[in-house]
Amino acid sequence: MAIQEKLKKVLRIAFIVAVLATIGMFWYDEIVDYYVEDSDLSETYPERSNVAVIKVHGHIVGYEEYLEDGWIQTSSETVVEYLDEINSDDEIEAVIVEIDSYGGYPVAGEDICNALKRTEKPTVALIKGGGASGGYLIAVGADRIYASRLSDIGSIGVTMSYLDYTKKNEEEGITYQELTAGKYKDTGDPDRELTEEERELLMRDVNKVHRIFIEMVAEYRGLEIETVEELADGSTMMGDDAKAVGLIDEIGDMEDVKQYLRDELNIEPILYVYEE
């Protein structure tokens, strides 16, 4: 009986210890959660992220509503919101924009480029597979551009196209009847041929967008207009060639960008990746 009583006493003590340990763990978690939520994380937890990474991948569109399932796309609306948020976040010391895009809507690319220029934190563009057309336009908004030797860079040009169903309609016996108010209202209608006057009208706008692109590259990259004009034939070039003509600053990858932040800006980078 004495042994049984001792055993019961030991079990009671063990149970009480277990309960107290559980209560202690609960309050420890509550205290940690309280301080994580309500204190300056940079002081309490030195591992707090201090460098934002924004990915600009695929086709560049203007709004989130334009994003389609199954397609790799980035909306300028979202990226600009991220950059505005970063500007007001004292924890973030620098921004890396990872680019793998061959362009998209001109206004969308310009919006992101201008938002980068407005950003008060140091900015670095890292071109992965491709930074061409609108993708390159975004890159020039950054303080510094890195790319791989194998990256496809440039394509400082503008393209516009339209469909022409006139021969197909003729073969199928379809007759096109036009009812239009306004001389150029149906310009680009695929059911009739484009007139020479309409072609000139469209080329006027294409050339104007091209000129703006050239001027932005020259201004933001510190290049002569004449230099950019020679490069602005719509072609792309590899990383080493792009560096030689001033389209990028350095050959490197994410580790090289992080080292640049350490060496030049005295930032020990802890990355936070924004996901769209």
Please provide the spans of the model-predicted regions.
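Active-site loop architecture of trypsin-fold serine endopeptidases
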Residues: L150-V158
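N-terminal organellar transit peptides
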Residues: M1-A125, G130-G134, R144-A147, M160-E276
